[in-house]
């Protein structure tokens, strides 16, 4: 599990435990754990690397990123398959010959919720540089827009004065998101192309924050105005130079969207879907 995937797994595990399930999390290195035979159901969170399920018990696959790497052979190993994209689930299901159920990403509604912190003026980005000059961060800075960056590997791409820290505690993210004027977000090219909405958008909106992101199919509609999208860096820069309050709905509408996300797009909601699927496979 990578950094973000670890928090995702922990949040989902806690939600399943609240539903009365006994849950163990295996990192990638433990994917062939010798005691896996005692598990009734294995759930694989498919990120950058393929993981074949244990030979024993039932297995569920939830594809949350890197859809361009999925093969029919990989899917054939699982009893049920979910994917965090509505359009990709339909297209890939037809192309690869497997039934794929849409199950969008989500947020930890226990952690990510408004705390009543006043909105400040910081334009915030949280994440690694990925070894590239990510346009969503570099282009605004080069255009004279101040961006407060949290994350590693940025020093060769932007001046150090824009880097607030090389990381931020997961527990500190809700307050940082809520207090930001706006949080910038972007996607891996394959995720953007295939309609995989990153879970950062869910986290920020659940915490009461506002997001500007690159365009992904269904993103702006799903978040009811709490997320605004751009199609080019010039459009992004124009948005950031303008009055950000004019881009987003009123506080009351944003609060309603935040409550809906915490209710409908929580780990608890997703855990219930996965538990129902697991019970269904065990009943076969």
Regions found by a protein language model. Give the residues of each.
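N-terminal pre-catalytic "stem/leader" segment of glycosyltransferase-like enzymes
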Residues: 1-56, 80, 88-95, 101-102, ...
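Catalytic binding pocket for nucleotide-activated donors in carbohydrate/polymer assembly enzymes
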Residues: 7-11, 16, 24-27, 159-282
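Catalytic core of nucleotide-activated saccharide and alditol-phosphate transferases
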Residues: 9, 52-145, 154-155, 265-269, ...
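Hydrophobic beta-strand scaffold residues
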Residues: 23, 59, 100, 147, ...
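Structural alpha-helical scaffold elements that stabilize or flank donor/cofactor-binding regions
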Residues: 35, 74-75, 175-176
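Short glycine-rich anion-binding loops that position phosphate/pyrophosphate groups of nucleotides
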Residues: 47-49, 65, 189
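Catalytic core and acceptor-binding pocket of nucleotide-sugar-dependent glycosyltransferases
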Residues: 147-158, 163
């Amino acid at each position: 599990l990578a950094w973000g995937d670890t928090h995702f797994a922990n949040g989902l595990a806690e939600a399943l435990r609240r539903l009365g399930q006994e849950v163990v999390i295996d990192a990638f290195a433990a994917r062939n754990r010798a005691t896996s035979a005692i598990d009734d159901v294995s759930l694989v969170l498919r990120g950058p690397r393929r993981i074949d399920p244990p030979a024993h018990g039932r297995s569920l696959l939830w594809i949350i990123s890197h859809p361009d790497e999925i093969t029919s052979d990989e899917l054939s190993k699982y009893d049920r398959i979910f994917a965090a994209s509505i359009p990709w689930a339909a297209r890939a299901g037809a192309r690869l010959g497997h039934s794929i159920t849409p199950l969008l990403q989500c947020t930890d509604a226990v952690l990510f919720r408004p705390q009543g912190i006043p909105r400040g003026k910081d334009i915030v980005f949280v994440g690694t540089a990925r070894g590239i000059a990510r346009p969503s961060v570099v282009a605004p800075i080069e255009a004279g827009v101040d961006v407060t960056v949290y994350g590693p590997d940025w020093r060769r791409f932007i001046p150090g004065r824009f880097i607030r820290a090389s990381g931020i505690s997961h527990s500190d993210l809700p307050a940082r998101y809520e207090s930001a004027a706006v949080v910038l977000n972007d996607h891996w090219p394959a995720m953007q192309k295939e309609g995989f909405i990153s879970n950062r958008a869910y986290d920020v909106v659940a915490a009461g924050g506002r997001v500007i992101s690159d365009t992904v199919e269904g993103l702006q509609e799903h978040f009811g105005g709490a997320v605004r999208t751009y199609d080019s860096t010039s459009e992004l820069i124009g948005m950031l130079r303008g009055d950000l309050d004019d881009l987003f709905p009123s506080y009351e509408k944003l609060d309603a969207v935040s409550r809906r996300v915490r209710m409908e797009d929580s780990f608890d909601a997703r855990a219930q879907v996965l538990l129902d699927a697991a019970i269904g496979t065990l009943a076969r």
